[in-house]
Amino acid sequence: VAQVQYQEQLTGCENDERFFNDKTIKYIPIPYLLNRYPSYGLNYYQQRPPALINNQFLPFSFYAKPMAVRSPAQILQWQVPLNAVSAKPCQAPPTTMARRPRPHLSFMAIPPKKDQDKTDTPTINTIVTVEPTTTPTTESIVNTVATLEASSESIASAPETTTVQVTSAEV
């Protein structure tokens, strides 16, 4: 029984029967549009209706047979609008743009990368041979020598100071 119902649904989808009749489309009468909206003007070569049923600003809608000015080859190329409601349950409902739900901020936490720790820290050789460094030290040696000069003026005992810098390398 289930297979028979499934096959009936498939045949209904293949026939592509619509909820509405393709030959009857709602149109707004042209004289109403000309009186209401004079910007349209007189158009003797009306190829498409200026306002369809979905126009929310026009209060009246009437059933009328569509007037096709195009050739039958072009009429076959016309496509069925995407917002047409289907009567069969096997056909998908019309798709609409749905907003994605925003996740809570607790889901937005980003864990730190494990590879990032390895790349940020440079590899340092911890085993380093210690080399003795020599630091030069300067010592000042002061020699005080009292020289007595015999002169005819006055004898002044002034000690002379000389500074000698000695550098030695200590480890």
UniProtKB/Swiss-Prot annotation:
> Which cysteines link up through disulfide bonds?
none
Q: Which residues carry this modification: Phosphothreonine?
A: 147
Q: Which GO terms describe its biological process?
A: lactation; protein stabilization
Instruction: Spell out the subcellular localization from the entry.
Output: Secreted
Q: What tissue specificity does the UniProt entry give?
A: Mammary gland specific. Secreted in milk.
| Alphabetically ordered keywords of this record | Glycoprotein, Milk protein, Phosphoprotein, Secreted, Signal
UniProt site (Cleavage): 107-108
Show which residues constitute the signal peptide: 1-2
Residues recorded with modification Phosphoserine: 151, 168
Q: Name one Pfam family in it.
A: Casein_kappa
Classify the source by domain of life: Eukaryota
Query: Which positions does UniProt annotate with glycan attachment?
Result: 123, 133, 135, 138, 144, 151, 167
**A GO CC term assigned to this protein in UniProt:** extracellular space
Family the UniProt entry places it in: Belongs to the kappa-casein family.
Role of this protein: Kappa-casein stabilizes micelle formation, preventing casein precipitation in milk.
User: What is the designated name of this protein?
Assistant: Kappa-casein
Q: Which organism is it from?
A: Tragulus javanicus
